[in-house]
From Swiss-Prot:
It comes from the Bacteria. InterPro entries: Fe-S_cluster_assembly_SufBD (IPR055346), SUF_FeS_clus_asmbl_SufBD_core (IPR000825), SUF_FeS_clus_asmbl_SufBD_sf (IPR037284), SUF_FeS_clus_asmbl_SufD (IPR011542). GO terms for cellular component: iron-sulfur cluster assembly complex. Belongs to the iron-sulfur cluster assembly SufBD family. NCBIfam families: PRK10948.1, sufD. The SufBCD complex acts synergistically with SufE to stimulate the cysteine desulfurase activity of SufS. The SufBCD complex contributes to the assembly or repair of oxygen-labile iron-sulfur clusters under oxidative stress. May facilitate iron uptake from extracellular iron chelators under iron limitation. Required for the stability of the FhuF protein. Pfam families: SUFBD_core (PF01458). This is Iron-sulfur cluster assembly protein SufD. The gene is sufD. One of its GO terms (biological process) is response to oxidative stress. Part of the SufBCD complex that contains SufB, SufC and SufD. Can form homodimers.
Amino acid sequence: MAGLPNSSNALQQWHHLFEAEGTKRSPQAQQHLQQLLRTGLPTRKHENWKYTPLEGLINSQFVSIAGEISPQQRDALALTLDSVRLVFVDGRYVPALSDATEGSGYEVSINDDRQGLPDAIQAEVFLHLTESLAQSVTHIAVKRGQRPAKPLLLMHITQGVAGEEVNTAHYRHHLDLAEGAEATVIEHFVSLNDARHFTGARFTINVAANAHLQHIKLAFENPLSHHFAHNDLLLAEDATAFSHSFLLGGAVLRHNTSTQLNGENSTLRINSLAMPVKNEVCDTRTWLEHNKGFCNSRQLHKTIVSDKGRAVFNGLINVAQHAIKTDGQMTNNNLLMGKLAEVDTKPQLEIYADDVKCSHGATVGRIDDEQIFYLRSRGINQQDAQQMIIYAFAAELTEALRDEGLKQQVLARIGQRLPGGAR
């Protein structure tokens, strides 16, 4: 089996964690496990994994521990937001910590039924891992024409354990947004403590005709965590989806967003902000298929890299043969804050249709000394001047958050990751 030297040990451990659940697992979960074992783990020789270090994770002793937390512990980690909140701890749904959903506009059922779930747009090994080890699926539905008054907040709390063991938690959600429906869904990932843990996340979303989705992801886990996520968006005709990801925490954080525009006149916006500090690595990946004509997509991905951090961006737009009048743009802007900070960026276009308008671009730079000088000349000290420029760089993304309270909490998290902040 191709892969890292210790990959067989990691695969065996994950296999044991799967078998520890007994015979109650779905056939689909078993199929993903078999695919995981057949595929093996990649090495740096694999192009898509060249810049994502796995050694620190693979050499671990994995456990699956379901902890109990109090409402007070939940509240200490929670967002201040008027929402319908579902709480998951160490991969498991906790009704006692969650809000009731009756009358909310969201129909929620949690089970291991996976027969109706969409196939992966871009499958890879950690997607198979999460699909196999996630113990249940959160099925969420918003009926035709419904517009829930409050956003749905999916809060994920994962604990690390003392010693060399790494707690492993996997979360699997699916949302069906029916024709003409409109909803906001927020994914919030936090750590219960400062110890190492490994989070896997998978969220698939069907956006039906004339439906409108606002999706926000907040990855705020601790500096020792590993986080691998795979979100799939499938849009029908005249559908709209806006997805905003703020990737602000984790030793290694790799987030994949894969999208299919399967109906004409659909509109897509995908934005992300990554801020690796110290020795952290944040890898952001997008895969977009323009499968029908007359669709519009815009992507803006920004990174602010400090110390010895590394940011990776890999994005691809694929325009199918008959997807005429496609309008797609993808931009990746990177700001280096440390002399040893690194960025690796690879935006790509694959166009098989005529009469389209597509572009991609990437920039990598540092703070302009003239900007600092201008602010210093007006009595602003060096650190404050630097922070003003960074906030301005991030503002294009944070301003997309409609809720002012949520925006301020994201800005506070950004502030913690700036030079001088409590990282």
